[in-house]
Amino acid sequence: MLCLPVFITLLLLVSPSAALPVESELQRDLTQDSPKDFRIREPLLLSKMFDRSCCGSSNTGSCCGRYQRGS
């Protein structure tokens, strides 16, 4: 009677799945970037890229007055 619980315990300790970290589907989904997030951030990213190119080394762009204080 004692052999069965000992065998099950040893089997659980030796199994390959015991070495892998447990990661739920929810945790995996929360840590990955989704295409929806990129579509939300894309206009903001494009506006930042445009503002940086507008306020380049010449500082003659019309948007440069807004961003000179922040840089």
Swiss-Prot record:
It comes from the Eukaryota. The modification Cysteine amide is found at residue 64. Residues 1-19 form the signal peptide. Its main location: secreted. It is found in: Secreted. Residues 20-52, 66-71 form a propeptide. Expressed by the venom duct. One of its GO terms (molecular function) is toxin activity. One of its GO terms (cellular component) is extracellular region. The cysteine framework is V (CC-CC). This is Conotoxin ba5b. It comes from Conus bayani (Bayan's cone).
